[in-house]
Design a protein with these regions (language model features):
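A short acidic, Gly/Pro-enriched loop at the edge of an enzyme's catalytic core
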Residues: 25-36
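A short beta-strand submotif of the Rossmann-like class I SAM-dependent methyltransferase core
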Residues: 38-42, 68
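A short His-aromatic
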Residues: 44-45, 91
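A short glycine-rich, Lys/Arg-flanked "PGG" loop and its adjoining helix->strand segment in the class I
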Residues: 50-65
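Short, glycine-/aromatic-enriched active-site segment of Class I SAM-dependent methyltransferases
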Residues: 72-92, 103
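C-terminal lobe and adjacent flexible extensions of AdoMet/dcAdoMet transferase-like proteins
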Residues: 104-172
Length: 172
């Protein structure tokens, strides 16, 4: 994938992009280096999402931003349904609740967060029928559980005030 990305950048005559192979929880990039980070349906597969968003924060320059598309849940997905969703969406195995996902982003220190897309991932009846009983299908269709594809935008503040305190407050 890295070779292909480099080929595409060369074809487009882009000289201000860089592609690196590395561990998303320990990126091979110095702090405050990247202007933009883009990810598509990857972070939900990483067990330690706090570490990933902390690492994204570290790598982004002050004022930099990310745009991340991922799969999240609303409501508890029974394990049997999770198996079905994996067959269809492929990205559901590590999905967490949407509120938890967005909370992790806020905890990492990001600001100006915006949900740019929030689309329900629907599973066709023929796939559901292969794995679920008619009763389970009816329960799923009640809408108590939702698998969603979201795209989130957020910025690293130009000034990092996560660990700052008011002058003279004695907190430091």
């Amino acid at each position: 994938m890295i070779a292909r990305a480099r080929e595409n950048a060369e074809k487009l005559k882009l000289n201000n992009v860089e592609f690196r192979l590395g561990d998303i929880e320990d990126m091979p990039v110095t702090a405050n280096k990247a202007n933009v980070i883009v990810s598509n349906c990857v972070l939900n597969l990483v067990p330690n999402k706090h570490k990933v968003f902390s690492e994204i924060y570290r790598v982004l320059k002050p004022g930099g931003h990310f745009s991340i598309s991922d799969i999240v849940l609303e409501g508890e997905l029974p394990s049997k349904w999770k198996e079905v969703a994996e067959l269809y969406a492929g990205c559901v195995s590590g999905a967490i609740q949407k509120t938890e996902y967005l909370g992790i982003i806020e905890e990492a220190g990001f600001k100006n967060m915006a949900l740019q897309k929030d689309k329900t991932v629907s599973i066709p009846d023929e796939i559901l029928a292969s794995y679920l009983t008619p009763e389970e299908i009816a329960e799923y269709k009640k809408g108590t559980v939702r698998i969603a594809s979201i795209t989130v935008y957020a910025e690293k503040p130009a000034k990092d005030d996560r660990n700052c305190c008011e002058p003279g407050s004695g907190c430091c």
